[in-house]
Amino acid sequence: VPEGETAQSYIRRLCEEGFAEKYRGEKPEYHNQLDYELDMIEKMGFTDYFLIVSDFVRFAREAGIPVGPGRGSAAGSMVSYCLGITDIDPMQYGLYFERFLNPERVSMPDIDMDFGDTRRDEVIDYVRRKYGDDHVANIVTFGTMAARAAIRDVGRVMNMPYADVDVVAKQVPSGPGALHITLDDALRLSKPLRDMYDADPQIKKLIDTAKSLEGMPRHASTHAAGVVITRDPVVTYVPLAKNDETLVCQYVMTTLEELGLLKMDFLGLRNLTVLDDAVKMVRRQKPDFRLEDIPEDDQDVFDMLTAGKTSGVFQMESAGMTGVCVGLKPQSIEDLTAIVALYRPGPMDSIPRFIACKHDPKLVTYKHPALEPILSITYGCIVYQEQVIEIFRRLAGYSLGQADMVRRAMSKKKRSQIERERQFFLYGDPERQIAGCVANGIPEETAKAIYEEIDAFAEYAFNKAHAVCYAVVAYQTAWFKYHYPREYMAALLTSVLDNSDKISEYIGECRDMGIALLPPDTNRSRDGFTVESEGIRFGLVAVKNIGRGFIQNLIRERESGGPFTGFQDFCQRMYDYDMNKRASENLIRAGAFDSLGAKRSQLVAVNDK
């Protein structure tokens, strides 16, 4: 906070400046929302929290570190938008501050931030420098014993032969549908396992013992994203340990939240790095190009997604998502938002109805006309948590905070609260100044049917704020793929250098797109994939046994001493840089010397000598 200002005056000034920049002209309704949020944040005592997040996001942007448009419910906040923490206009997409900070339920705010995965640590380092190493710490996380691991660990302690234990462990169902399966579930689902359990006393003892251990902590590690920032040294509040010279809180994240400590997630998102790399390549021809300036309604981009050309597009490239794109034929970021929200276990069942209603408006029905302005954007289907909140507000007169409390109860299946609220939804609650549907002119039977539908869907409804953020990134990646295919695919290939399956997939996609792939070249390649007039040039990092340090030395030598004139010249100039025979042979076999004229077989023979 600058000298002469309080936290409250400073955040208001920053928000007013951001508001003026984002909304040119009079927007009284929007400004009222900003004032309301600032008052609420001040009353709840979270002003400093927002200033801290705003500060490290500002640092990231000024340092050229890619920052995501937002993540989670924080994108529903006008304050977050005006401070530059998020890039999503909450008013444009109908998002609610109360879904993020609920005045009816005071809890710590939770702003998670996405940064480019290769530079995320720079932001955490900035926070350490700003507040002091002893005021910032990572968070411990415990890996727990899953069903199979528990069987194997217990079998080892019981001195059972590994092969016998392995046979038992492999009877526990695995795969995506068996994630977090318990041994009780496994005994119910796997007949061979049940037969072993019933027939062999030793195996019964093995599984019973494993049952008592599953879910227990097995090992400690550091949480991938969580960081705690404290006013006094962290050791004042929690026990600490060191992991690779980094301070780590010995309490898990939920305990830290219960203690009221300030916890933040700094997440690395590979796709932000891809976009940033693609932008840098485009700027070599168009220096003024900015990602923020791309149009949000490019029909050619949506046509590409409709055609199923989704490989490399954030969130959309799985076979299932591609199928939804082809069926839905998205025409807007709102449509992409719905796809992100619906493609999950549970809501997936309503995708066919959603698609049918989009293409045939006659199929769209509303139990009451008051639902149309709320559900028309999703063709009559309840998709978002924000829609559940709005139904309670508009039809029954709940405040947004009260409505979110009911939505939370429904998502957590708190039946007693759900049944109690049913009466209030229908007939009101004078104590909380809720009028109820009947008093608002909605027939009793209709109101009952609406409540039943909300109850059925609320468990699966998705946070629209988060879906919008990821839909925007999905659209940006699709836009780049369509308009700057070589730059985008080069950046994409560089981002998956450690994943041979993805490299193969994206090389195939390049060929389908008619993009030529050029071999590595000691005189033209850099570390990652790069764009040339003829196509995309392989990066040297893609060549096995070639370290990044050696590549940087090669590039420096090439830039200072000129292009390599032949294999002998290369060997002489790179001799002092720890070049080994294996590395040079791999460069030869990858074609990195082809442009110098000699045949690969000849160079391999020379290299062997």
Enumerate the language-model features and the residues they cover.
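Noncatalytic, beta-rich nucleic-acid-contacting surfaces in large DNA/RNA-processing enzymes
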Residues: V1-K609
